[in-house]
């Protein structure tokens, strides 16, 4: 389709429109073993993408119970892939990360900030 001498992109109905939708219902193994080195303190300085996560507490009742894998992280949000793709604000939620056989709870307020800067913190 043409408009103002520019061709529009074809938005096919089967093409994913949001980031991560192509990954839904696919089996993925995101992380290996942490070898017992992951604690609450080290998780704050760690890469979160690929970890299994669950929202255990939130000021918005519709967010409680969402679980899946972290597929993207920004300064203020975590993008979680489960039965669908959610963008969860960090500031309003408390997360439970599953690392190996351990479950680590972290308030979202502790995670707020650019991921690359959080990794540099000591």
Swiss-Prot record:
Keyword terms, alphabetized: Cytoplasm, Endonuclease, Hydrolase, Nuclease, tRNA processing
Record field: catalytic activity: Endonucleolytic cleavage of RNA, removing 5'-extranucleotides from tRNA precursor
Annotated signal peptide: none
Gene Ontology terms: cellular component: cytoplasm; ribonuclease MRP complex; ribonuclease P complex
Localization (cell): Cytoplasm
Annotated InterPro entries: RNase_P/MRP_Rpp29-subunit, RNase_P/MRP_Rpp29_sf, RNP1, Rof/RNase_P-like, Rpp29/RNP1
Pfam families: RNase_P-MRP_p29
Function: Part of ribonuclease P, a protein complex that generates mature tRNA molecules by cleaving their 5'-ends.
PANTHER family with a match to the protein in the record: RIBONUCLEASE P PROTEIN SUBUNIT P29, RIBONUCLEASE P SUBUNIT P29
Protein name: Ribonuclease P protein component 1
UniProt gene name: rnp1
């Amino acid at each position: 389709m043409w408009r103002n001498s520019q061709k529009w992109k074809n938005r096919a109905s089967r093409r994913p429109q949001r980031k991560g939708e192509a990954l839904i219902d696919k089996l993925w193994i995101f992380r290996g073993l942490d070898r017992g080195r992951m604690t609450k303190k080290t998780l704050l300085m760690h890469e979160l993408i690929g970890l299994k996560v669950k929202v255990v507490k939130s000021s918005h009742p519709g967010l409680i119970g969402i679980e899946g894998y972290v597929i993207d992280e920004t300064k203020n949000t975590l993008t979680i892939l489960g039965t669908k793709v959610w963008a969860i604000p960090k500031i309003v939620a408390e997360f439970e990360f599953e690392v190996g056989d351990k479950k680590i709870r972290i308030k979202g307020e502790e995670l707020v900030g650019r991921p690359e800067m959080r990794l540099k913190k000591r």
